[in-house]
Every structure is written in C-alpha cells, then in structure tokens.
From Swiss-Prot:
Subunit structure, interactors included: Homotetramer; dimer of dimers.
InterPro entries from the UniProt entry: ADOMET_SYNTHASE_CS, S-AdoMet_synt_C, S-AdoMet_synt_central, S-AdoMet_synt_N, S-AdoMet_synthetase, S-AdoMet_synthetase_sfam
Gene it is expressed from: metK
Region Flexible loop, residue ranges: 92-102
Name of this chain's protein: S-adenosylmethionine synthase
Positions with a binding annotation for L-methionine: E56, Q92, D231, K262
Keyword ATP-binding on entry: yes
Gene Ontology cellular component annotations, sorted alphabetically: cytoplasm
Annotated source species: Mycoplasmopsis pulmonis (strain UAB CTIP) (Mycoplasma pulmonis)
Pathway: Amino-acid biosynthesis; S-adenosyl-L-methionine biosynthesis; S-adenosyl-L-methionine from L-methionine: step 1/1
Length: 376
C-alpha cells in the first residue's frame, strides 16, 4: 500500500549555515544591548578557514564584531587558530532609515515582502510533528556533546524525520536519519550505537510513538570533516529549519541578523503568534496566515488565512477577526511582542517557533480566551 509520507529536517549548532546565523544574532543582541534603537542587518559567510561579516549597522554604541564571532566559534569547539575573521560592515541606507526611523505611529515597513505564520494541534507546542522531532534530536545531541556523554561527538550535525500519515489520526515515524560529525579516531559502529541509544530512542520515547521505524546514522560512513572547513555557510540559508520544516509556506525572508524593524522577522513572528492562539482556541486544527507589506507602508497590504478545511468557520471570517482585533503595523508588532527587549541569539538554532525551552513573546497563549469568546 502506498504510504502518505512527509519529511522535515533540522541541523545542529555547528552546521556551517547555523554558525553564521548564530554570529549574526549574537552581534544583533550586542548592538541592541548598548542601544535599543539600533538598526542591524548582519550577514555572515564562513568558507574553509575564512569568516566574513558584512551588512549594515547604525548604532550609538560600539561592538567588537570579531570578538563576538569568536565567542560563538569557541563555544562550538574551535580555537583562534582555526579561522581568519574579516569585518566589512556599513551603516543602514538613509533612504531606508527615513521610512523606519519616524518616531510616531507612522513607522513604515523597512521593505516589501510576504511573511507566513503557522500552527497545528499535532504537538503540545502547536508545531508540525516532523520538525518537532527533528529539532529535539539535534537539541539532545548538542546537550550530550557539551556534557561529553558521547565519545568523539562534534557540533556539526543534521537530523531528518519522515512521518507516515496514512492513518491521519495515528501518525507514525517511518524513518529517522542522523548525520553527526565526530573525531577521526572514533569507531563508527560504537558511535552509531551511542547515537541510537542515547539520542534517538529517548527522543522517540518522549513522543509515545512507534519504535519500529527505519533508522540511518551516518549512512555515508565517516563524517570527521565538518563545519565551515567541510562546507560553506551563509546567514539565512536554513529558513525552512527555522520555521515549520516545509509544512507551511515561506515568504523567503530570513530572520537572523535582522533587528525588530525588519518585517521579514517581526511580521513572521506576529503571524505565528496569531495562528498559534487561534489553533489553541480550537478555531481550527491547522492554520496558516500570510501577511504582505510594502516599503514605507504602515499597514499590511494583505492578510490571507488558510485553515485547510479544519475549521467550522470560513477563512474570510477568521481573516476579518484578525484584521479587526490585531494591530499589524510595524510599531504595533514591536510593542505587542516586546521585540526591543527580546534576546535573539537563542532563536538562531533549533528553530524560532515552538520553543518551550525559551520564553518567547510570540509563543505566548494570551489571546485564547478573547478568541474563544468571539468564536462561540
């Protein structure tokens, strides 16, 4: 019988793209700490033994960008002999600043774009099942790496989880794949056994799902050369890992390195916040919200809702509720989600959504009662 399969992946902190995301967001946090009104758009490239920091920063303070980069790299097991770091950062374009820096309710979007928010009742965090398991696998692996619980485990790693939805009410794990960097002298059979017993099995047990899944650990054999030395990394190259694992649309804009005035980030967070509260209020079992903005414009150009046939209310009814009950101007989003005071670095790995381990404002369920009263 043909199976109904869906797959999502996640990556660890030492993945080259994620190293770049972490450097970008650590710089963002440092800049906002000294000047909460700073503007920041940091892009990092890591290739072989060279790391380049580019982008724009406008701030009243000073941050040593190279030192911030080393903090991340050293935490991942590298030394100052491993890389050369070059910084080439400019100020924000004055034409963009003219739209963003207005000090009243007329703050406009810093760019055009489309953003999506999504929620599903599949998991307690209102995230799709496949990406939730994939994140938990690399999260546990990183914890064991830091604690030195698995011999030779290093920080570059990937997970991939395939869910069988042939029975929609009882999804099953079909396949789990993990590739994890390790020291050269590691015995691969022992390493694979440790990964299965100490990482994969405990995570699967947490979900109370089937144990008869296919499992592949380092299927290509040895994986001793990793991180930027093995592959080039760039900020913003893991946007599906950062969001919903492919279970929802993505507008294309990355998050890391961008301050709260960038609607690529702030509006995507707001769309998630609204979708999660609506699903938690049982308005729908699954919900996707699209927002679109134009540069310099205060309100979104469009709001679109897709409940995938899981709601007794029409998508237009839900759209009208959003339009009439949530202020979606950039200024209102910043204030509602307290984005000036949020620490962004912790979101730069293991996903920006469904993070029960973090106290993120866009994950709060503080609109549920209000929504339930409206949708009686």
């Amino acid at each position: 019988m043909q199976k109904n399969l869906f797959t999502s992946e996640s990556v660890g902190r030492g993945h080259p793209d994620k190293i770049c995301d972490q450097i970008s967001d650590s710089i963002l946090d440092a800049v906002l700490k000294i000047d909460p009104n700073s503007r920041c758009a940091i892009e990092v490239m890591a290739s072989n033994r060279l790391i380049i920091i580019g982008g724009e920063i406008t701030t009243q303070g000073y941050v040593d960008l190279v030192s911030k980069s080393w903090e991340i790299l050293i935490s991942l097991g590298y030394t100052e002999n491993d890389f050369t770091i070059i910084s080439n950062v400019n100020e924000q374009s004055k034409e963009i600043a003219n739209q963003v820096d207005r000090q009243d309710d007329n703050i406009g979007a810093g760019d055009q774009g489309i953003m999506f928010g999504f929620a599903s009742d599949e998991t307690k965090s209102f995230m799709p099942l496949a990406i939730s398991i994939a994140h938990d696998l690399v999260k546990r692996a990183e914890k064991l790496r830091v604690e030195n619980k698995i011999n030779g485990l290093k920080s570059d790693m990937k997970s991939q989880v395939t869910i069988d939805y042939s029975d929609q009410k009882n999804p099953k794990i079909d396949t789990i794949l993990m590739s994890l960097q390790h020291d050269k002298d590691v015995l691969l059979d022992n390493f694979r056994n440790d990964v299965k017993k100490l990482i994969i099995e405990p995570v699967v047990n947490d979900y109370n799902l089937n144990s008869n899944y296919k499992c592949f650990i380092n299927p290509n054999g040895s994986f001793s050369i990793g991180g930027p030395i093995g592959d080039t990394g760039l900020t913003g190259r893991k946007i599906i890992v950062d969001t919903y694992g492919g279970a929802a649309h993505h507008g294309g804009g990355a998050f890391s390195g961008k301050d709260y005035t960038k609607v690529d980030r702030s509006a995507a967070y707001m769309a998630r916040y609204i979708a999660k509260n609506l699903v938690a209020a049982k308005v729908a079992k699954k919900l996707e919200i699209q927002l679109s903005y134009g540069i310099g414009m205060i309100e979104p150009i469009s709001i679109n809702v897709n409940s995938f046939g899981t709601s007794k209310f029409s998508d237009l009814e839900i759209t009208d509720f959003i339009r009439n009950n949530f202020s979606l101007s950039p200024k209102s989003i910043i204030e509602k989600l307290n984005l000036k005071n949020t620490k962004y670095f912790p979101t730069s790995f293991f996903g920006h959504f469904g993070r029960d381990d973090l106290d993120l404002p866009w994950e709060k369920l503080d609109q549920v009662d209000k929504i339930k009263k409206f949708f009686k």
